[in-house]
């Protein structure tokens, strides 16, 4: 994300990390023209404190809503413009990722691997990735759609099984997981 942010900023895109959009700005014709950020410096009682700053209007030729799963503003946009009128319901999944520092002899800078299916069984869908980054680091992850049929399926355990595949496991030999995370995605 940092790399992509740098590329966007080099093209003139303004990015405001730490400022949540609280509402949508529309012009007189109902066209989205930006967002209003949330107020800052609001006390626990909901009243403005001595450090209060009202939300800012951020206007742009283009406004991208990248809130993640079930974002509040995205829901408003979908409803207002009936974006779900002639479409299938959204699909949801869980994505699990890890960052590894691996043995230099197992590192192949630039290697990209994407898979689909295994080790998931019938009635489940998903896939994985593995990216060999700089500094002997590997990003590895696994995504499982949340509409799986087996109530006992554990996405985390399936991810661990994936890393034991004969074509994958040797990359992690003598390696160390240095960070991990999970996120709902749609």
Question: Language-model segments: which ranges?
Answer:
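Predominantly flavin-linked oxidoreductase catalytic cores and closely associated redox partners
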Residues: 7-170
